[in-house]
A protein has these predicted regions:
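Helix-start (N-cap) detector for alpha-helical repeat units in TPR-like alpha-solenoids
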Residues: 23-24, 57-61, 94-95, 128-129, ...
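Structural marker of alpha-solenoid helical repeat scaffolds
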Residues: 52-55, 89, 123, 157, ...
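Register position in tetratricopeptide repeats
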Residues: 35-36, 69-72, 106-107, 140-141, ...
Length: 271
């Protein structure tokens, strides 16, 4: 009897090993297909792997790959289902949750995106992507206190994090602390005098204050430092229009189009 039991377990181990090998082969085939942009073939391989080993610990990652495939196919609802299925298997998978949060955000569901980013922060308190995106969402929903807290958390972990530095300036500017915001952006410019973005941000702040000459000087400086950035030409064109300098605005929109801006948007700007 003992001999038959041993044979049974030997056969079972062999079957499990072959099943694992087949699963691995299918996953490898799927990854190879992804590398060749054969999305349908990759999807078929990943689904076959999960059918063969429905309880495999790696299936949550396969759902993540399937979600990304669906996103590339512009099937966002199906992508969301894939990410959610993966999280049902592995709720603490940070990368999966970040992917779903980003998709929620692109689909316009900021509340669910913020919820997923909060879950990531509960798992990793200094996850920069989650903190930055939650701060951005909070600011867009006028929760400036919450946004400021997230940016400050980022700066404790990374004191020179540019996204947090800029985000804090913009939050202060929008939340009734304009003097502090202007002092902060000017301090950044004094430390990083060759950073075009900072001049563009200060120029925008000055424009909102109707300090047109200062704004023009800063936006022109941004263009001189980074002449290939279409956004800076668009910003200066908007300023020129407020200053009733339509010819100069038109010249900047034409340059922006040459640098990749949407011609229809530029035409609409000049109407």
């Amino acid at each position: 009897m003992r001999r038959y039991v041993c044979v049974f377990f030997f056969l079972l181990a062999g079957l499990l090993a072959r099943g694992q090998e087949a699963y691995t082969d299918l996953v490898r085939q799927g990854m190879d297909a992804l590398a060749m942009d054969s999305l349908s073939q990759a999807e078929a391989s990943f689904r076959a792997a999960m059918s063969k080993e429905p309880t495999h610990h790696g299936n949550s990652e396969l759902f993540r790959y399937l979600g990304r495939i669906k996103e590339r196919q512009e099937k966002n609802s199906e992508a969301l289902e894939m990410y959610t299925s993966g999280l049902n298997l592995s709720p603490n998978n940070v990368e999966l949750r970040l992917d779903r949060a980003a998709l929620y955000y692109r689909m316009g569901n900021q509340a669910r995106a913020a919820s997923d980013y909060s879950d990531v922060i509960d798992l990793q308190s200094t996850n920069m992507e989650a903190l930055q995106m939650r701060a951005h969402i909070r600011a867009s929903m006028h929760d400036y206190k919450g946004a400021r807290a997230d940016y400050e958390t980022m700066l404790v972990a990374e004191p020179h994090n540019e996204s947090a530095l800029v985000g804090l300036v913009l939050v202060n500017d929008r939340s009734g602390r304009p003097r502090e915001a202007m002092e902060q952006i000017s301090a950044l410019i004094s430390v990083y005098p060759r950073r075009a973005l900072f001049y563009a941000i200060r120029g925008g702040m000055e424009q909102r204050r109707k300090q047109y000459e200062q704004a023009l000087a800063d936006l022109t400086q941004a263009i001189e430092l980074e002449p290939s950035c279409a956004d800076y030409y668009v910003s200066r064109a908007t300023l020129y229009l407020e200053m009733r300098k339509r010819r100069l605005a038109r010249a900047d929109t034409q340059m922006a189009v040459r640098l990749g801006a949407d011609p229809r948007e530029m035409a609409s700007l000049l109407k």
